[in-house]
């Protein structure tokens, strides 16, 4: 997680990306861990991480991922994945009225070494984010303060 340098205060963007990163560690996925935070007017209104639907077996508990077994890469075989994406979970936990004009913060973690994974919403999540009225999407792209991007959403593969 990003921390302040010396006596400086951490930026709001890095603060919310830290929250997203913390939620990524709650992920039940063994391929990649993602966390998302939705913020409006400097208030956290929702959080989410990628994992199986409530009440279903988690891949981390089963010790198996169908996409890993088939050698699939990022962006491939989403239909085989049992997880709900972090962005989807965050959006499901609040109303559209709350999300209009809000910002979404997304962080990804590689499970093997806990390094930062350059996260980006998939086409389906992009459409959901647009439909929810989210204003900006911030992506953690590095382990240092200020290492983030504002995402331009895409809606087709």
Regions found by a protein language model. Name each.
Residues 2-10:
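Secretory/periplasmic and organellar redox-cofactor proteins
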Residues 11-32:
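Short, basic/aromatic recognition patches
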Residues 34-40, 46-47:
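Short beta-strand scaffold segments in enzyme catalytic cores
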Residues 51-71:
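A short, polar/charged loop-to-alpha-helix boundary motif
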Residues 70-92:
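Acidic helix/loop or adjacent segment enriched in Glu/Asp that either coordinates divalent metal
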Residues 87-119:
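Mobile, glycine- and charge-enriched loop segments
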Residues 112-113, 118, 127-131, 135-150:
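C-terminal binding/interaction regions
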Residues 154-157:
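Conserved small/polar residues in nucleotide/adenosyl-binding loops
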């Amino acid at each position: 997680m990003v921390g302040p340098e010396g006596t400086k205060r951490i930026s709001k963007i890095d603060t919310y990306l830290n929250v997203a990163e913390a939620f990524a560690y709650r992920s039940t996925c063994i391929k990649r861990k993602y966390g998302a935070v939705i913020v409006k007017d400097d208030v956290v209104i929702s959080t989410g991480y990628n994992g199986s639907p409530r009440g279903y077996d988690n891949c981390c508990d089963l010790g198996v991922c169908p996409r890993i077994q088939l050698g699939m890469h990022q962006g491939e075989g989403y239909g085989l994945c049992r997880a709900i994406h972090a962005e989807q979970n965050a959006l499901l936990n609040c109303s559209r009225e709350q999300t209009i004009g809000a910002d979404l913060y997304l962080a990804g973690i590689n499970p093997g070494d806990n390094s930062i994974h350059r996260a980006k919403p998939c086409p389906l999540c992009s459409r959901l984010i647009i439909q929810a009225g989210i204003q900006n999407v911030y992506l953690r792209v590095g382990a240092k303060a200020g290492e983030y991007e504002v995402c331009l959403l895409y809606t087709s593969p």
